[in-house]
Amino acid sequence: MMPDIRIRDAAAEDAGVIVLLNDAAVQHTSAMNAMRLQELQTMANCNWVITVDGAVAGFLLAMRERAGYANPNYDFFTARYTVFLYVDRIVIAPEHAGLKLGTRLYEALFEHAHAQGVPVLTCEYNIEPPNEPSRRFHDRFGFSEIGTQLLDSGKKRVSLQAAPVRQ
């Protein structure tokens, strides 16, 4: 039987699971405790979870321009685009690999951006150390590199990516 997969707005009771999922993927994203999650959620245009048979299996946080987000990657896109949707993080529980949950979230995100008249989606992923699964995933959605920058006192380099939203 096919699992019941749904995307919905994150609820307060999802916070614990979201923080645990983020902690498990922290080498590819940035640390986030419950307080930081709440701060990000207040700035988010998309604060979604994806569920499998009712259980949270992943999440996505994305911010629009002028969200007031103090982040060097977000600032990079703010300097280049007047209207955009920035993916701060997308995390899927490894035990749900193969269900295409990330693909479902991004398909919904592109539809959402289109409905809001947003012309471009932006994000970044690590290239030092490399995050090859993220690179391959974003390539499939038409993202291309528009810059790179060093973070964490030179310990990490990210590829800053943008993809057009078909209007």
Where are each of the predicted segments found?
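Conserved active-site alpha-helix within GNAT-family acetyltransferase domains
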Residues: 127-147
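Conserved acetyl-CoA-binding loop-helix of GNAT-fold acetyltransferases
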Residues: 92, 98-111, 140
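A short beta-loop-alpha structural element at the N-terminal edge
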Residues: 5-18
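C-terminal "cap" of GNAT-fold acetyltransferases
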Residues: 148-167
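Glycine-rich phosphate/pyrophosphate-binding loop shared by adenosine-nucleotide-utilizing enzymes
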Residues: 5, 55-59, 85
